[in-house]
């Protein structure tokens, strides 16, 4: 990477199911585009790939497999997009991502009772985000929505376990806790304030789990 090339920023949204990640990530992408920032919006799992289609059937409870197998598939789904993400960032394009490796650890360790260190190992070496916005809502926040429960992890007791596991990342300096029980506009405004603090300057990549 040349010194005069500004690397794009990598922003991740994390949180429980139905915490507002899709809404807030879309709003941020719109904001960046309106401010002449070239940006790519990604989602994990990406259900369009071969691996992603298997994951999608699992989440919809249309197939079953061992806990270890599904965890490794989630990780593989992230790895198959690493070249794309790296290429975008090197071109100066920002990447906004709905879920990332932190979901893998929180869900597999919290919901499936897999060892936390074991869960982290497959994602070691993935590109580290510049900032993670954790949309913090209570585990029972979305239980009254009409479509709640359609996917395998959408149970309040399961969400409670995942919620506790997410706390392992709260000490990271790039992890920003956002109260997501408020109005959509207020949440978005807080996120924009944090994004404007991100320095855009030449730098090398950092990787998980450094």
Curated annotation (Swiss-Prot):
UniProt activity-regulation remark: Inhibited by deoxyguanosine (dG), deoxythymidine (dT) and azidothymidine (AZT).
Alphabetized GO MF terms: ATP binding; dGMP kinase activity; dTMP kinase activity; guanylate kinase activity; nucleoside diphosphate kinase activity
Pfam short name (any one): Thymidylate_kin
Disulphides: none
Coiled coil segments of this chain: none
Entry function: Catalyzes the phosphorylation of thymidine monophosphate (dTMP) to thymidine diphosphate (dTDP), the immediate precursor for the DNA building block dTTP. Can also phosphorylate dGMP and to a lesser extent GMP, dUMP and dIMP. Can use either ATP or dATP as phosphate donors in presence of Mg(2+).
Protein name: Thymidylate kinase
Natural source organism: Plasmodium falciparum (isolate 3D7)
Gene name of the record: TMK
């Amino acid at each position: 990477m040349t010194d005069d090339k500004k690397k794009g920023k990598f922003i991740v949204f994390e949180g429980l199911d139905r915490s507002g990640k899709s809404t807030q990530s879309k709003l941020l992408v719109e904001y960046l585009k309106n401010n002449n920032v070239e940006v790519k919006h990604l989602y994990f799992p990406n259900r369009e790939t071969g691996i992603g289609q298997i994951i999608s059937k699992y989440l919809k409870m249309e197939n079953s497999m061992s806990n270890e197998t599904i965890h490794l598939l989630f990780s593989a789904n992230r790895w198959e997009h690493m070249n794309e993400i790296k290429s975008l960032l090197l071109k100066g394009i920002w990447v906004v991502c709905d879920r990332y490796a932190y979901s893998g650890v929180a869900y597999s360790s919290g919901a499936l009772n897999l060892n936390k260190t074991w869960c982290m190992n497959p994602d070691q070496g993935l590109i580290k985000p510049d900032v993670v916005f954790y949309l913090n809502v209570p585990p029972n926040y979305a239980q009254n929505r009409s479509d709640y429960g359609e996917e395998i992890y959408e149970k309040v007791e399961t969400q409670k376990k995942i919620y506790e596991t997410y706390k392992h990342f709260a000490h990271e300096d790039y992890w920003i806790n956002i109260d997501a029980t408020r109005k959509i506009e207020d949440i978005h405004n807080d996120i924009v304030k944090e994004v404007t603090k991100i320095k855009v300057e030449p730098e090398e990549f950092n990787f998980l789990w450094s």
